[in-house]
């Protein structure tokens, strides 16, 4: 049993920051995966999982373009602060750069990832597509314009994952 998946990002934009870095944006993209790592957008799809199965991702087609990039802003952390008058507020704070900035390779490593979630008796596959991957050492941005993949569902024994 398999599920076919096709995702495309026809364009992206960079939101300039005061320090000269940028935060890339894509249509319908979400942000903030891990504080300290490059602030790159991702797209999320939720797919119901067939009973007692796990999926293996097979990328069948990937169209990408690599280009030079200005520095990408790290994902900030959020801290709860209390003002003098006792009100609380959330403040974004930059933390030391995370592992995504330390490697000479693209981050995230894979353009497509899968994890599982349960809601009551239903299981869901959380498919994360990374339309942009960043190599901070070389200052390169990989734009994954289009990806096609197969999710091959393999039955598993109960109680193991």
Predicted regions and their residues:
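Extracellular pro-sequences of secreted precursors
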Residues: 1-161
